[in-house]
Amino acid sequence: MYLLSKARKKGMPFFATPYYLSLLDITGKAYDDETIRSYILYSPQLVETYGSIRAWEKEDVVEAGKPNAAGWLLPDGHNIHRRYPEVAILIPDTMGRACGGLCASCQRMYDFQSERLNFEFETLRPKESWDHKLRRLMNYFEEDTQLRDILITGGDALMSQNKTLRNILEAVCRMAGRKRRANARRPDGEKYAELQRVRLGSRLPAYLPMRVNDELVEILREFREKASAVGVKQFVIQTHFQSPLEVTPEAREAIRKILSAGWLITNQLVYTVAASRRGHTTRLRQVLNSLGVVCYYTFSVKGFQENYAVFTPNSRSMQELSLIHISEPTRPLYIS
């Protein structure tokens, strides 16, 4: 409580759903909850450095009218992040700029520090100007010759209300259709890359799986049908399960519903110290794979002094990879 009090005095937000807090062992005797406990409760180093945290990735530093470190000229504002030729991140001006919980190792902690991302839900509701801005952001994807993959995140993509999320997905679908029709008029050798994959980044399947209601599933199903007709081939919910403790009956039902809409679920494991203990991630992969979740990415904690307490050396990540049998279907495809 001392650390939380100190964090509050520094203006550092703390947010977790009652559902997720209920997964913690408050007795300290029933089971080992360190993986999820260290994910939402802050270390002394994080609290101490809050206020001076900077973007870990130089590409995430955006100045109006100037290319970022990767050489991409981006629209004004902080809605689009881009590091690679074929993919860009879209952060909507909606409640998607909040999360179901603030992860202690969050890659966008500097955005919470600047309050571009926050938990003041009323202030995050989309304003009338958002629809106009969304059209302008879609123009960026439509007019780019290389982009074929859009990752809608935040914050958390599923924090947006169903109506708002539907509007965003419909805008993406219209953009993909226009880009495809424009390509039909272009000669060979001058055609643009068409949208192939749409991803929604969300940790709500773990933080608040009840968010995956029937209306959301129908929105996902309808979008998949419409977007498939204009050439989109992959539909992915990209999530973070850290521990088998998170795979509750509610989470299993959320996974089942998403898969029933024809979307793929992929898991990015954030390789914290607690998650890196031998045997822990193996069990997590077994559980998720049995439910149809693809465990494809092990994410090394980035940052500086603020994440010292949860950083796992990359050598441990490589050791984990080497211990997984080649024939094992749970083997992650990437380590970053």
Residue ranges and their predicted role:
Residues 76-80, 91-95, 137-140, 187-188:
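Catalytic micro-motifs at enzyme active sites that drive phosphoryl/nucleotidyl and oxygen chemistry
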Residues 122, 128-139:
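Active-site glycine-rich loop that binds ribose-phosphate moieties when present
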Residues 324-335:
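Single conserved hydrophobic/aromatic residue that forms the stacking wall/gate
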Residues 134-142, 155-321:
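Conserved AdoMet/S-adenosylmethionine-binding subsite of the radical SAM
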Residues 82-127, 200:
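Canonical Radical SAM [4Fe-4S] cluster-binding loop centered on the CxxxCxxC motif
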Residues 4-12, 80, 125, 156-160, ...:
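Conserved aromatic-histidine-acidic binding/catalytic patches
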Residues 1-84:
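Flexible, acidic/Gly-rich N-terminal and inter-domain linker regions that tether
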